Amino acid sequence: MEIEGFVQAQTILRTPKFQGAKFILQRNTAQIEAKYHFLQEGQAFGWLSLGPLEDASLTVIGRGVYDSIYDIGDAFSDKFTHQEKMKRKFEYKLREVYLDTAIPPFSFRIGRQQVVWGETDNFRALDVINPLDSRWHWTRESWEDIRIPLWMVRAIYDIGKIGPLEESFVEAVWIPWDFQRSKVTTDPRRPWAMIRGIALQVQEKPRSCIR
C-alpha cells in the first residue's frame, strides 16, 4: 500500500489601480492518494497465480477544498446568500478511482481518471479528452489540477521497437456515458468570472465513442 498527499493554501489579493487591496482567493486544499498493488509479477496477494495477468493495482484519490474568500472577503461574502456561499466555498469529492491491469503486451486502466495526450504548458493541442474546471484561478493552475476526471476505459498495446523507434504503442480511450462540459462562470459576483454573454450551451450530447 502506498499513501501520499498534500495540503495547500493559496491566497491572492487584487489591487485595482494600485490603490487598496482585496482578497480574491483564499483556497485551502487537502488531497490524499492511496495505491494498492494486489497483483505483482503474476502473483495475487503473494501466493495466488492468475495466469497471463501480470500486474494489477487500485488507485483512489480524494480531494477536499475550502475557499474562505466567501467568509473573509467583504467584496464577495456580502453578495451571496448563506446557501449560495455554502455551495461555493466547500468541495469534497472522490476525484479519481481506477484499476490498472497488465496482460502483456496490453495494459488497461478502468475507472474515473485523467487521460493526457500531448501535454503543453500554456495551451492544449491534443490534451482535450477531459473537460476543465475554469471557475477559479484557471489561468495560473496546472492542467492536472483543473481537469475534470471522467469514467472511461484506457487501453494500450505495446508494439515495442520499430526501426529507429525504441518505443511505440497504440492507445485507445472509450468513454461509455460520462459526458461533461467544461465548467466556467459568468456570474459577476464571483472573483474569477469570465466575460458576461459568453454562450455556454451544448446542443447535443455526444454518443459513446472510441478515440
Predicted feature descriptions by range:
Residues M1-I3, K35-L58, A102-F106, D121, ...:
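Short loop/turn motifs that connect adjacent beta-strands in outer-membrane beta-barrel proteins
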Residues I3-T11, L58-G64, F108-R112, V170-P176:
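Transmembrane beta-barrel strands of outer-membrane/channel proteins
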Residues T11-T15, K22-A30, F90-R95, R147-W151:
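Residues that define the transmembrane beta-barrel architecture of outer-membrane proteins
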Residues T15-G20, G46, Y70-S77, D121-D127, ...:
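Outer-membrane beta-barrel translocator domains and adjoining extracellular loop/strand segments
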Residues K17-A21, F80-K85, H137-E141, I210:
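Extracellular loop and loop/strand-boundary signature of outer-membrane beta-barrel proteins
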Residues I24, A44-T101, N122-F123:
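Surface-exposed loop and membrane-interface regions of Gram-negative outer-membrane beta-barrel proteins
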Residues A30-Y36, V60, E96-T101, V153-D158, ...:
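Residues on the lipid-exposed face of transmembrane beta-strands in outer-membrane beta-barrel proteins
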Residues W143-R211:
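Signature for the C-terminal beta-barrel architecture of outer-membrane proteins
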